[in-house]
């Protein structure tokens, strides 16, 4: 990325990420939920956040629809705008990790290269890619917004899975079968991964 601003320097905080993590009692990380529209990314992200909140973790969900009401309101759905959308979200997610927070990002993010760029923004291990695996058929059946129908009729151009490709992760940290398993099973799978990684502490039996 080429910076358009000159004569700017990065100011280091006297309160470090480690300080904030110690205060919070858990590590910070990016949970990146990716998958087709209707795969259950946002629903799963909020369910995982609810579980983490009950464990007294500091969290925040960045949702693909919500972000387009503000930070990315100027972007459309062309390939170029999708790239910029994910770039902005990646930078925001990185700031959340510096704040000691577990950030849950729920975006279609259809292109591997864009997801890889976010991974490269943060130290190794800080980007946890969660592939919400559901078939196109299942996603269309769940389509309460009618987006797939509009996409197939040509009303919505560049729609992922119909007129624009989705590139599944090749080596995601977690694969959740949101097209087959229950929401509770998928959420527990994510929580157990975080506990095994030492990001959050195991709950008492």
Swiss-Prot record:
The active site is at residue 109. Pathway: Sulfur metabolism; hydrogen sulfide biosynthesis; sulfite from sulfate: step 2/3. The keyword Mitochondrion does not apply. InterPro entries: APS_kinase, P-loop_NTPase. It catalyses: adenosine 5'-phosphosulfate + ATP = 3'-phosphoadenylyl sulfate + ADP + H(+). GO terms for biological process: hydrogen sulfide biosynthetic process; sulfate assimilation. One of its GO terms (molecular function) is ATP binding. ATP binds at residues 35-42. CDD domains: APSK (cd02027). Keywords: ATP-binding, Kinase, Nucleotide-binding, Phosphoprotein, Transferase. Pfam families: APS_kinase (PF01583). Its EC number is 2.7.1.25. Belongs to the APS kinase family. Catalyzes the synthesis of activated sulfate. HAMAP family: Adenylyl_sulf_kinase. This is Adenylyl-sulfate kinase.
């Amino acid at each position: 990325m080429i910076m358009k601003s000159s004569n700017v320097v990065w100011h280091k905080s006297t309160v470090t990420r480690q300080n904030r993590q110690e205060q919070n009692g858990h590590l910070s990380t990016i949970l990146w939920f990716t998958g087709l529209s209707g795969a259950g990314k946002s629903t799963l992200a909020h369910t995982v956040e609810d579980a983490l909140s009950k464990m007294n973790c500091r969290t925040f969900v960045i949702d693909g629809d919500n972000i387009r009401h503000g930070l990315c309101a100027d972007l459309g759905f062309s390939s170029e705008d999708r790239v910029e959308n994910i770039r902005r979200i990646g930078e925001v997610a990185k700031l959340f990790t510096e704040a000691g927070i577990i950030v849950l990002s729920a975006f279609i993010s259809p292109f591997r290269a864009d997801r890889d760029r976010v991974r490269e923004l943060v130290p190794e291990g800080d980007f946890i890619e969660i592939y919400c695996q559901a078939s196109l058929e299942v996603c269309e059946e769940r389509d309460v917004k009618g987006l797939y129908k509009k996409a197939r009729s040509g009303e919505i151009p560049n729609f992922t899975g119909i007129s624009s490709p989705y590139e599944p992760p090749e080596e995601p940290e977690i694969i959740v079968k949101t097209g087959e398993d229950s929401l509770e099973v998928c959420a527990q799978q994510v929580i157990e991964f975080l506990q095994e990684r030492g990001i959050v502490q195991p709950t008492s039996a």
